[in-house]
Amino acid sequence: MRFAGKVWRLLVGIKDGLVLVFMLLFFSALFAVLTARPSPASVRDGALLLALDGAIVEERTEVDPFAALLSGQAPMGEYQARDLVHALDKAAEDDRIDAVVLDLDRFVGGGQVHLQEVGEALDRVRAAQKPVLTYATAYTDDSMLLAAHASEVWVNPLGGAVVAGPGGERLYYAGLLDKLKVNARVYKVGEYKSAVEPYNSTGMSEPARENARALYATLWEEYRANMKKARPGADIERVTTQPVEWVTAARGDLATAALQAGLVDKLGSRADFEKRVVELVGDDEWGEGPNAYPHTTLATWLSDNPLPTKGKSIGVITVAGEIVDGDAGPGVAGGDRIAALLDEALDNDLAGLVVRVDSPGGSVLASEVIREAILRQKARKIPVAVSMANVAASGGYWVSTPADRIFAEPETITGSIGIFAVVPTFEETAAMIGVTTDGVRTTPLSGQPDFIGGFTPEADAMMQAFIENGYEDFLSRVGAARGMTRDQVDAVGQGRVWDGGTARQLR
């Protein structure tokens, strides 16, 4: 019995050992299978996929998740121009990337300056002998300008491509305000300061029309020049000057018309496009769908290619969006927030400061808060440069004045040296429904501002004087910064906007 017990224990031990070996082999094989499948967060040999589901921006807007949840809508995607340029430049020199694929089906746009910056980065990818392919159901001005830099532009046969050019119409509310008996009190300095016109006019003034025509003509010329350079074979003149004849010649087929005009290279479905990418980079055995190809997303690629940190630091501050009082942003230029960021950097050993401006302006007070913070940096005797993106106008120019050098692109919209305010009062609206006001004043300013009873003549005059003083401050800041007299600045000011190329020549 003792011998049988030993044999039994031996057999049980062998069984347990075999089970353990089997389990080790099973989990080793399972681990090998799982690790063989590429992680979505890892860079793969193949294509760099830029699925631009949204807009190219200077600075991403801070999203309030609670507000997004209440709205029931996902926020629009935003892609920083500098991230895209950096990603493309790294793709051009990295052997793991064989091609760049742009999915522009849900691309919203980005402004000519950003589009040109990204387009030039695409050119550098092509110069490295790597193909660039784009796909969209339909192309419009911005997506077409970006796609023009690709080696292959694909469009869905049921889609097309249309280039409309800058311009259009805006809404004017003066007639509505008259019917509602709302008094829109306009205070401004600047013959060309057209932002107030929707509130006191039913159409464009001649100065505003003149300014818009000149600006749009220059922007349009830059657009066409960039298109011709990127796609020499595209008949952009016919597409934009004879659109009806162009489309009619293709029997109303916009996709075929785009192909015939050289705007696109291929007509095909998304599946056809993906087959073409597979031909260039190979198929993805782990991918889903019949035409999957190995690719790396933008987020993964940026994580694998951080910005360089060597050398002495150069501070970069972004002023993007409307300039407002307080701590708003990013994506909105809160004056206090940006000033705090600049002041935090006072203790850093900076070789210089670059202020990147992409703003149409806003609050004068917030603009001055930012300007003063830039001056505190400049007091350290470091060089300060301003780099203008799509727009650096009004308050956007105000914050640029401390710079030693200002850089702009030909397509940059700048200037708009002028100040305005619009204050609605409802005395006639109230009277229309039987509400009136009365009282006693000790001074002409007692009870002012009164939005229901209206402004006194003295309050009106003081408001206009305040705006005029602000304009004189603006002129003096620009004059001191650019070495111009007050009258020289006034001659190019008056609220007029300029393209970057023309602004460079003004004196």
What role is predicted for each listed range?
Residues M1-G252, E274, V278-A481:
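Small-residue-centered hinge/linker elements
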Residues W154-V155, V264-R270, F407-A408, R507:
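Short acidic-hydrophobic, aromatic-tinged amphipathic segments that line or gate anion-handling sites
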Residues G233-Q260, K266, A481-R507:
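Amphipathic alpha-helical substructures
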